[in-house]
Amino acid sequence: MYSFRMFRIISNNSKHSKAIHLMRLDMIQAIPFELKDQNFNNLNNVFIGSNEERILTFVSLNSSDTASSNSMLRRIIYRYKDKGLVRTTTLANNENIVVSEEILLTDIENLQIYFGDSLDDLNNNYPGLNVVENNAFPQFVVLDYEINDKKFNQIMSFFR
């Protein structure tokens, strides 16, 4: 018989795996859709990443919504807020209309995210400060973080 402690460990590991797999699935389904800000101004970028609260923003296909009357495109926003990883989906062209919001992980410490086209040349922000317009995704997204004093390093890609 499993003890409560063992059940909690299995449950936490399962949540962690599901969160990372969901992030990877979102990246695989990402499309080059130019983003607009909350005032509907063109940002001339298809992907925005930073080490601020809002770590990832891009548009992806929504495979769970099969209704033909609605667009299957969703803006995906990942936030690092109050030591948690939060996934928010909105309409692709209107960030003000939230479709769903879910806390995927809690108790995350020291989250750092890096972006780049080579693992030897990663940056804290994407696109870089000197890029005005970018219609591409970074080749790599690297997340370094700790949960319950265990260090994790995830290397992900948009496969573009």
Language model features: what each stretch is:
Residues 109-160:
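Short linear sequence signals and composition-biased patches located at protein termini or domain-edge surfaces
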Residues 69, 95-104:
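A short, polar/proline- and glycine-enriched secondary-structure boundary/capping micro-motif
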Residues 68, 88, 97, 123, ...:
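Short acidic, gly/pro-rich beta-turn/loop elements at beta-sheet edges
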Residues 74-76, 100-102, 150-156:
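Short beta-strand segments
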Residues 71-73, 99, 138-140:
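Short beta-strand-initiation
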Residues 2-94:
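Extracytoplasmic beta-strand-rich oligomerization domains located immediately C-terminal to a leader/signal peptide
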Residues 28, 33, 102-117:
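Structured surface patches comprising rigid loops and adjacent beta-strands/short helices at the edges
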